[in-house]
């Protein structure tokens, strides 16, 4: 039984795995530290008495997390609750994806994200740097990627609908509105890496290929498949541009991709894992492209879908030669041919009947692990912050479509991403992430970013750190009432625990 049932009154989030409230408080602020090699990685032991706080830690991360818990034990009057806690993570991967490709976040905002990750004992910042709608990775070798890919026009058809209301209010005639240029510098990246390292957070950079490449192709149109009709040197804002594929049959395109990865590794020194994307690539473009068909004939590839596997293996081998392991979305292992030892997989499409009916690859995480792959769970049904908090969320309007559905705090907390795992798969499940996608947003600033992420990110943090079994949402909800006040006192925009229209909103007052 985890500590939430012992320490509910202390409102610790994420809940410690073991602990007991011993009663009373102390004003003694003395803290002593000692290393304890018997504790699990990232673990700590905390004892608060009248003599102050005693902290034993396994490593630097454990020492940091002990201080985080100690801070949460403090009352507004400065006194600290007496308690004994032993704590360590259930999973080594506790991540948060930030999509800066669609909507840019300056480095100062990323520092804020990293601070909030420490507060919730999260340790992987997944930095989604390239997209159809924007290129944010600096590059000296391919300057047009920044010159043309870092800005876009709001000019696609149908933009006078409700989704564009707030942008029109802010900038007037959006048909003349240019977003950007926005791109990080090498110095920005170095600062983010240093800030993350000091907080024991891994930074995972992502260059998403071969799909989601409109910004790439806008810079270098000849590297896209033939006959797609893309306008040269222009990026616009349109969701789901699945025909924006890099031409896998073009040797120059493939070499340019590898060159970008090389430059990325220079900017992320010491990185041992790089995200290569691989999701939502539209095979229709390749099937119609003479160069791609020629590649298939040359390599003996019978199925156009297997063309992506050929490309994926080439990228993986290139990174492996430099001592870097690849990680990618679920589609990269849809077909056989990618060795499990070479890659980590993020199966992101939740296996519901609608997705299966479309013929999309949507396995359960355990099904991918059963094939021998290391897995990070990434459910679009329970962990995507692009979806609204509730069906009638006025602040996060969405088109009336079956594809758009609310993801409540309770949905996220009750998600058992390790369900179906067998003892033989032990060690292959690395953890899970929350995903701040911004493709379903017309306008986006840091308030929007935080409002969409909280309080749901708190649920991801707890299920990845504590992985309580069984889940007790009532207990989590009770602790979150206090924790939400903490976050708001820090200036973090948060949606209500029980938004209007949710099942709980009718029976309780939302903080």
Pin down the residues of each PLM region.
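Generic recognition of stable, solvent-exposed alpha-helical segments in well-folded globular domains
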Residues: 109-112, 184-191, 252-259, 306-314, ...
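Feature activates predominantly on carbohydrate-active enzymes
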Residues: 21, 41-273, 314, 318, ...
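Contiguous, structured surface segment used for ligand recognition
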Residues: 9-93, 448, 463-497
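Flexible, acidic glycine-rich loops studded with aromatic residues
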Residues: 326-331, 336-511
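Flexible loop/turn segments at secondary-structure boundaries
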Residues: 6, 104-106, 132-138, 210-216, ...
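Active-site neighborhood of glycoside hydrolase catalytic domains
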Residues: 218-222, 234-344, 349-372
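Sec-dependent N-terminal signal peptides
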Residues: 2-9
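Hydrophobic alpha-helical scaffolding
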Residues: 60, 182, 236, 246-254, ...
């Amino acid at each position: 039984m985890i500590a939430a049932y012992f320490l509910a009154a202390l409102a610790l989030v994420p809940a410690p795995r073991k602990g007991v409230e011993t009663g009373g408080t102390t004003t003694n602020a003395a803290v002593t530290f000692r290393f304890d090699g018997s504790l699990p990685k990232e673990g700590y032991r905390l004892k608060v008495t009248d003599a102050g706080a005693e902290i034993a830690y396994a490593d630097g991360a454990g020492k940091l997390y002990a201080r985080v818990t100690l801070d949460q034990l403090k009352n507004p009057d400065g006194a600290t609750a007496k308690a004994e806690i032993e704590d360590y993570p259930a999973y080594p991967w506790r991540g948060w994806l930030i999509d800066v490709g669609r909507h840019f976040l300056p480095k100062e905002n990323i520092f804020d994200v990293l601070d909030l990750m420490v507060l919730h004992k999260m340790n992987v910042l997944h930095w989604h740097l390239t997209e159809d709608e924007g290129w944010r990775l600096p590059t000296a070798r391919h300057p047009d990627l920044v010159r043309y890919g870092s800005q876009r026009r709001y000019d696609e058809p149908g933009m006078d609908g409700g989704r564009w209301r707030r942008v029109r209010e802010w900038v007037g005639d959006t048909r003349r509105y240019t977003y950007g240029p926005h791109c990080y510098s090498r110095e920005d990246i170095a600062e983010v890496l240093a800030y993350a390292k000091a907080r024991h957070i891994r930074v995972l950079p992502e260059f998403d290929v071969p799909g989601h490449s409109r910004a790439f192709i806008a810079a270098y149109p000849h590297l896209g498949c033939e006959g797609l009709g893309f306008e040269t040197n222009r990026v616009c804002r349109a969701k789901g541009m699945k025909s924006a594929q890099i031409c896998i049959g073009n040797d120059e395109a493939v070499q340019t991709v590898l060159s970008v990865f090389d430059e990325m590794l220079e900017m992320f020194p010491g990185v041992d894992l790089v995200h290569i994307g691989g999701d939502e690539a539209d095979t229709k473009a390749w099937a119609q492209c003479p160069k791609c068909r020629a590649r298939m004939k040359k390599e003996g590839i019978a199925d156009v879908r297997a063309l992506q596997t050929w490309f994926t293996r080439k990228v993986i081998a290139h990174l492996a030669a430099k001592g870097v392991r690849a990680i990618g979305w679920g589609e990269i292992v849809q077909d056989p041919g990618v060795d499990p030892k070479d890659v980590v997989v993020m199966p992101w499409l939740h296996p519901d009947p609608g997705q299966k009916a479309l013929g999309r690859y949507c396995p359960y995480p355990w099904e991918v692990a059963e094939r021998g792959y290391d897995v990070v769970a990434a459910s679009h049904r329970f962990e995507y912050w692009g979806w609204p908090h509730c069906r009638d969320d006025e602040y996060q309007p969405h088109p009336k479509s079956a594809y758009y559905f609310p993801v409540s705090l309770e949905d996220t907390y009750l998600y058992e991403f390790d369900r179906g795992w067998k003892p033989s798969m032990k060690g292959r499940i690395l953890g899970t992430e929350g995903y701040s996608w911004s493709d379903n947003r017309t306008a986006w600033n840091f308030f929007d970013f935080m409002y969409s992420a909280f309080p749901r990110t708190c649920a991801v943090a707890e299920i990845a750190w504590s992985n309580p079994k069984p889940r007790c949402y009532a207990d989590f909800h009770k602790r979150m009432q206090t924790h939400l006040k903490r976050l708001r006192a820090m200036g973090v925009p948060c949606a209500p625990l029980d938004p209007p229209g949710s099942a709980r909103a009718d029976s309780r007052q939302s903080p």
